[in-house]
């Protein structure tokens, strides 16, 4: 069930956040309003992936700009503005097929994480090169991967391959 996966991922993120010094600890905002989610969908021009909707309904944004290179996940209003400005690609291609996508997160370096509308797979867009690469097969998988980054950051692991 999608909701349980998102809830599990949020618990994992909160646990990982607890490993960090208080000054670097990520913040978890309250739920986005129905109007904010509707405005995001209007900007995207599609129904957003169910898992991302569940995330926004539970936690509008996760802000961790002091963790490694910075993570900003969600934020319905900010994402709607970004989509309206055309900040990031609206289509993701795996080499053989292209599919509509939307931004769901950014890092501290100006890159974005895009979710394909149809399947929720998450891709990293490098704003300097224009290259888009797969990161996770699902939004909850992406959130679990971010949690792993945070665990390794808390352990001062310089060998870990961070996604940001």
Task: Give the positions of each predicted feature.
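A sequence-level detector of short linear motifs
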Residues: 114, 124, 133-134
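Short acidic-glycine loop/turn motifs at beta-strand connectors
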Residues: 116-119
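Compact, glycine/acidic-enriched structural inserts
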Residues: 130-153
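Intrinsically disordered or highly flexible coil/loop and linker segments, enriched in small
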Residues: 22, 152-156
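A surface-exposed partner-binding patch
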Residues: 1-113, 160-164
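Short capping loops/turns at secondary-structure boundaries
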Residues: 93-97, 128, 132-135
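Intrinsically disordered, low-complexity regulatory segments enriched in Ser/Thr/Pro
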Residues: 121-127
